[in-house]
Amino acid sequence: MINVFQQPPQGIQTAPHEPRILAAGHQVAVREVDLEGVADKEGLMLAFLRGLGLTDHFGRNWDALYDVLTDPDARPVRFALVLRDYGHFQARHKQLGPQLQQVLLGAQAEAAARGRSLWLLAEEPDHDTRHW
C-alpha cells in the first residue's frame, strides 16, 4: 500500500491506519477535527476551533475557516487534517457537507499554489455509535 504522504495531496482521501505515525516519518504536522457530534454550522465551526487549536477570535464562518487553513504563518508547510466521521457527516448534512468540502478543497488548491501541502484525510470511527 502506498503511503498517502509519499504523494501530493489529492482531494479528500481515506485516512491511513495510524496517520500520526506515518505523518511523523514524512515531517507532516497533523491535527484532528471530530465531526461526529456536529448538528449545525455553529457546531461545525466549534469542531474546527477545537481541532485546530484556534482562539475565540476565530470568525466561525466559511471565509475564516478558509483563511486559517491557508495562513502560512499558522499552518506548517506540510500539514494533514484528519476529519473524523467525515463520511457520516456528509450523509447527515446535505447542505453543510458540500459547503465544507468546497472550502477544504479550495484551501488545498491554494496551499498547492503556494508550494505547500494540505492533506485532507477522512477517518471513520471504529465502531458505529449512531442512534437513529
Predicted regions and their residues:
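Positively charged, polar, low-complexity stretches
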Residues: 1-132
